[in-house]
Amino acid sequence: INTIFFYLPVLANNSPVDYVNTLVGTQSKFELSTGNTYPAIAMPWGMNFWTPQTGDMGDGWTYTYNADKIKGFKQTHQPSPWMNDYGQFALMPVTGGVVFEQNQRASWFSHKAEIAKPYYYKVYLADHDVTTEMTVTERASLFRFTFPEEQNSYVIVDAFDKGSYIKIIPEENKIIGYSTRNSGGVPENFKNYFIIVFDKPFQFTAVALDNAIKTNQTEIEGNHAGGIIGFSTHKGEQIHARVASSFILSLIHISEPTRQEAI
């Protein structure tokens, strides 16, 4: 996994893709557009895009250049802010207290500590002293979180509102779930099923429902479900998360090629 991240910038040095700045066009808002884009990390014709999220849950302007806080790193399928998104969910690393609500977990960031390429994204979350990196395949993604020395390091999984589900499986270092959030144009049984596998055993687990944290449960379903897993970390410790998703199959029957992309 470390080799993948190490070679990403090397491979792109002599490639036209390395000249692409995905932050161009992100200084937009409802009242005024300068592009209405977001910094997508994606493969050509990829099933899923990923993006840092500065806007509130459900805000079509998911990332705006003038914002100074990141609230999560979101899987997105959004074609434009006017059409909004569907099937979205997000990950967010935090340190210190156990939180879930999007504004409580948000962290200040600077564009000086941000790298945004079509194939790779990196940012330093100052409030949590965590560096987040993302890269993708056609159907899956890989996260690397670099934590400080901290007894209370966490990763939040937010399946968003309007109907979602989370199950934490500690013995497999795994979280599964689904998101049904959408803005129309989907069938009644629409779900985006996801599976997230970590490379470090969980020392803490909790779920959340409508921002209320429940530490005695590992499974939750309702309007707005989420999960929280925690670790004790040493300075510079890197934790990886592999993510795959499917619109068609339940997590139990997720296709082997999709599993392999995540693994």
Predicted regions span which residues?
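Bacterial Sec-dependent N-terminal signal peptides
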Residues: I1-N14
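Accessory carbohydrate-recognition regions in carbohydrate-active enzymes
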Residues: N13-S255, R259
